[in-house]
């Protein structure tokens, strides 16, 4: 296996930065913006695919193909290692999970997380979640680990058990998931910093903290997370939320005032856009090709 596989790049980033900040990229353009800002890893949110690409809620409606489309668009242009939200594995059988792992890895992702919610899943920070048995989730993880062909591809287990069964049961699940082969752990909707320390002590694998806005988890700083032995800080939809609010403002002002003059200051300039997508390099290449064609 190549030493430069996406999975190895993700693990290398994790080794260099503590905690590793992983930002959500709703599309390929945002992936490039994250790269320019200096991030070492990016994330594709299942809720982001549903809301951003499909205009639908995060209730298990998106398909594997929906996710693969967005993965390919990102990995085609951005070299940063990509962590992907694989929900419950896009199907109820081990074969579904295996197909999901193989497909996501083939599309160029570095890592995925798979969760222990039931098929009719909900956003991890909403009420009335339901989870499968510990044994069923262990089977999902085993199927995922068995399906990968690159040992560096990261299989991360997410558990939503805290809100459903309590901390001790969630810790018990965490240990079982690691024993089943999970490389890293994503305890969802954590409410206290000390809980992360418990997961880190029990699991003895890298722990991810989902620092999403307007949810159950406080907006802990990287210093606070580091003190709690958190290895990864995830910001799944921060830029997406800001983008949506900016779009709402522009649409409203343009409709009400008949001009965009009063919102120009919040817009990315033409030159800034071109620089972020390497427009000028493409243009220079095009000019060179036409010069060669004429000569």
Swiss-Prot record:
One of its GO terms (molecular function) is magnesium ion binding. It catalyses: (2S,3R)-3-hydroxybutane-1,2,3-tricarboxylate = pyruvate + succinate. Changing residue 121 to A: 1000-fold decrease in the catalytic efficiency. Retains the same oligomeric state of the wild-type. In vitro, dithiothreitol (DTT) or reduced glutathione (GSH) are required for optimal activity. GO terms for biological process: propionate catabolic process, 2-methylcitrate cycle. Belongs to the isocitrate lyase/PEP mutase superfamily. Methylisocitrate lyase family. Pathway: Organic acid metabolism; propanoate degradation. InterPro entries: ICL/PEPM (IPR039556), Isocitrate_lyase_ph_CS (IPR018523), PrpB (IPR012695), Pyrv/PenolPyrv_kinase-like_dom (IPR015813), Pyrv_kinase-like_dom_sf (IPR040442). This is 2-methylisocitrate lyase. Involved in the catabolism of short chain fatty acids (SCFA) via the 2-methylcitrate cycle I (propionate degradation route). Catalyzes the thermodynamically favored C-C bond cleavage of (2R,3S)-2-methylisocitrate to yield pyruvate and succinate via an alpha-carboxy-carbanion intermediate. Disruption phenotype: Cells lacking this gene are unable to accumulate 2-methylcitrate and 2-methyl-cis-aconitate. Gene3D superfamilies: Phosphoenolpyruvate-binding domains (3.20.20.60). Homotetramer; dimer of dimers. Mg(2+) binds at residues 85, 87. Keywords: Lyase, Magnesium, Metal-binding. Optimum pH is 7.5.
């Amino acid at each position: 296996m190549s030493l430069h596989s996406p999975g190895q790049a993700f693990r290398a980033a994790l080794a260099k930065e503590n905690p590793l900040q992983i930002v959500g990229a709703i599309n390929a353009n945002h992936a490039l913006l994250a790269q320019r800002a200096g991030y070492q890893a990016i994330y594709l949110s299942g809720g982001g695919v549903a809301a951003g690409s499909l205009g639908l809620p995060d209730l298990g409606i998106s398909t594997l193909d929906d996710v693969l489309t967005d993965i390919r668009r990102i990995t085609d242009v951005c070299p940063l290692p990509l962590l992907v939200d694989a929900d419950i594995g896009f199907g109820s059988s081990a074969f579904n999970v295996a197909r999901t792992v193989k497909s996501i890895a083939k599309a160029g992702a570095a890592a995925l997380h798979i969760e222990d919610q039931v098929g009719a899943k909900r956003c991890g920070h909403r009420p009335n979640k339901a989870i499968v048995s510990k044994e069923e989730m262990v089977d999902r993880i085993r199927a995922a680990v068995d399906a990968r062909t690159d040992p560096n591809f990261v299989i991360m287990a997410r558990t939503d058990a805290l809100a459903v069964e309590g901390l001790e049961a969630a810790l018990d699940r965490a240990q079982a998931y690691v024993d089943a082969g999970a490389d890293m752990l994503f305890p969802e909707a954590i409410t206290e910093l000390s809980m992360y320390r418990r997961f880190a002590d029990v699991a003895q694998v890298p722990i991810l903290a989902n620092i999403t806005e307007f949810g159950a988890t406080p907006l802990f700083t990287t210093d606070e997370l580091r003190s709690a032995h958190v290895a990864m800080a995830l910001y799944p939809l921060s830029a997406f939320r800001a983008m949506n609010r900016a779009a709402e403002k522009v649409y409203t002002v343009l409709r009400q005032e008949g001009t965009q003059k009063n919102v120009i200051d919040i817009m990315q300039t033409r030159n800034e856009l071109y620089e972020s997508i390497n427009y000028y390099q493409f243009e220079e290449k095009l000019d060179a090709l036409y010069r060669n064609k004429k000569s």
